């Protein structure tokens, strides 16, 4: 026998709707409000229906979408509620929960409160029209009559709250119970999902209990599902929650996870005494027992349970142990302080005790210093602490000395020693900036080697002087053309040669300045060589050339008189007849054209050739005069050419890649300059 089914249909049509509010809180929460002039309602229950007209009023729609889509479904879960007023009174309030889809113009939700009940709510707002459609079907109660079903067909909510429920009809008890069951099923599914996704253990709180009215039931369900939807957010579900297990049964109250980490950390660094106990247990036992036998056990602090917590804890325990015997060895312990500076990477800063013997760094390592045994008795503990601190200071001193020897150059000379106070205050130990140490004011500075400190200071001074452009005071040899005497002799500047020789002799490279007499070099300087460099190098007789600029650009100037004299001196040794001076360039070009006769015989074209030669010589002389006038104007304005007029009339030449490029100083010359500079600093 088929059970009777009740179907409720409602169709709202609004005239002249105007949207006055549209607030989108986020991607899943949307509120829209409209005002209208008139409205018409078509209300149908099963086979009956009626029409209702309303005057001016407003409509408010709330759309909420939360959580993830259910398995096999393309829509997300949510709810939609619509409240309608007209003639100053509340006329309708609709609420449906289920799969929801909404956009700018259409919002629709389809829900099912159980296997025997389902509902549909749709709102369409486009082209100046606003329509709301609501359809719901459910099974009738056995005790419900047809009139009761008709009265219940005028229900206004999806939670089966009928209009007659306000009067206490029997059909009102069926709707809330089904809604409550549906809510409980959803909560159970949410709880299972939270457990599977490793969510928090106490996460799923039940929703509010549904009351007799539709507003109360919907409000409790709304709060429950909104919270469940927030927890079902995949971004929050993928995040690992912090587990907080109950504290262990031990008296320290620390969680078992931290206890296991502490035991693992302390087990890796075992001591060599105390009946097989590790160092951390002995230290904690000694501190807890007031310096006694160390039988009590004290756990690590909560803030030192990291992987390197044993470093900080060992250092603090050693400070506690040493402070317990402070009245016996106060005069020895006030200079050695062992602590960890705040903000460092966990390494121990071990200042060197004054008067400590520096040993080889290979004999003792910082890792072995941390695992030194400490006896349980008070007096023997103080002595062992003193021995371990002395070994630590010796190892640290050896490390510092090796670092300084690595930085100090082997060729630097020894500087006069300075006082220990000056070394402690001014000498940098490392190139990196060490973070400020809170124990620096109380801890004494370690003794340093005077020899290496002076070398470091000298090198630092040299680097600072290099930065300030006052590296050395060696004179630079000029690259200009040297003046020439009447006999073809080039005279070198005696003062510059003497200063250069004195500087090089001071550097220990060549002979002293007294062994260098005033130099006069007979001969000429070729046009393709650097003037003034080769004679100075030959006069000093050093394996390296005198200091010159790193790069120099030679001027585009040649000396034709010097070149002619060089050619004359070379030809005088081979033949008695001197060579004629070279013809001008224009005459040379015309001469080549004149020698190339076009006729076959020489006698027939003699006159023509002489006329051509005369005309060409006259025209070339006119052009050369104009060119010379232009050259004279350029030479008057060129200071470089005026300098070259001392040796004769100069002229410009074209650039040459072989002679006019950048000249690079040899590495040996740079080494000589550096050696002279270092020697000058040490002589000061």
UniProtKB/Swiss-Prot annotation:
Chief location: host cell
Stretches for region Disordered: 166-301, 317-336, 357-393, 407-452, 569-658
Modification(s) after translation: The isoforms p34, p43, p50 and p84 are cleaved by host calpain-1/CAPN1 and calpain-2/CAPN2 to generate p20, p26 and p28.
Bias type Gly residues, positions: 201-220, 285-296, 598-607
Pfam families per record: U79_P34
UniProtKB keywords: Early protein, Host nucleus, Phosphoprotein, Virion
Keyword Protein biosynthesis among record annotations: no
GO cellular component, one term: host cell nucleus
Subunit structure and binding partners: Isoforms p34, p43, p50 and p84 self-interact and interact with each other via a shared N-terminal region; these interactions play an important role in their intranuclear targeting and in the recruitment of UL44 to subnuclear sites for viral replication.
Descriptive protein name: Early phosphoprotein p84
Phylogenetic placement of the source organism: Viruses, Duplodnaviria, Heunggongvirae, Peploviricota, Herviviricetes
